[in-house]
Amino acid sequence: MKNQSENKVYTLAEVLGKHTIAELKQMTQVLEVKVLSKAKKQEIIDALSAKLLDKELLTAWLLAAGKQEIEELELAMAEDVVIAEESGRFYYWRNLPVVFVTGDGVVVVPSETAAVYNEIKSDSEYAQKRSRINVFDEYLMACVNLYRAIDITTFLSIVNGQTGLNAKRPELESWLKDREAVRGQQMYFFEGGYILSEEYRTKKEGEVVDYHQLLERQGAMSYYIPAKSELLRYADPYYVEKTPSYAAFCRFIQVRLGRLENEAAVIGSHIQLIMRHGAMPKDIFAEMERFGLTEENEELMSDFITVMMDMYNNTRMPETRGFTTVEAQKADPSRQKKIASASEIVTSSMPIVKNRIGGKKIYPNDLCPCGSGKKYKKCCGRVNK
């Protein structure tokens, strides 16, 4: 099938008609559309069409969407977009559903839906709200990716200071509440005075991660607030800061593990991202085993620990509110003990590495090669005993 871009227009009835009666009835349950138990397929399609083209409902869905999601929707209306079956793209729109995916992976926006969208978009009041929401969303994405949790007062100070938006707390809280009513606690949400990453969702099945533990680790430390251009890079959840320690880590992967340059960059980016998500060294070692790093080669392992801990200590972490461990120690020497204690726990999970690095013996009073800043005898040396 073709999309609208090549003069092939799909009506909502055509798209819905490709679903089975069972699938259509499931949609009626999700959308709270009442139909008779013995309703015919066309009757179900008509009822669903009326719901999906409701201007007020579609407006609510649009206002709950993020900036990138709006761009995604408009792209699908303008040209062919083909996605893999397992792709996470268009998840929000597919889940509602506003868009549909054909058997050959083409994303379809029904013609009636596109018409209602264009009508809503032309409304000046909607356009003004959408413009402000775009700013909120981009900054919210950046802040939850960098900090995981940020108090709403600080967030507004950052947004207003960098954009001149002059947003007030009631406006932001109201939108976050409306957004959650539509899509739950996806991406980010507001609770207890904090804007939180979705990993701390309180309304989901399974284990709940307590954000208070993160706040306790952060303590009273201030936020690292980068310039606008740098901060907004974090709106991309896969953004990786190309620091000198990152470059050194990638060079190690390329030279010592025999990987191609682009492979080394992918591995380095992956490791930095899982570090920011709280991965401990034991988790990193488990990942690195796939790429040829083994405990049997002690010299290789020793050198790896050095470059790994250097990248860890120079990566911006949520636990230090966007500061690197090195920056946090310089800014607040009182945190040195806390950070060293954490490093002590970290090194206890490392593979055993004999007291040498690069063939050179490490003496008890030498600085530990893991980067903790402690003497070897009080860090990895104690573990190796």
Region spans (language model):
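Acidic/negatively charged segments and metal-coordination signatures
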Residues: 1-49, 53-55, 63-146, 150-385
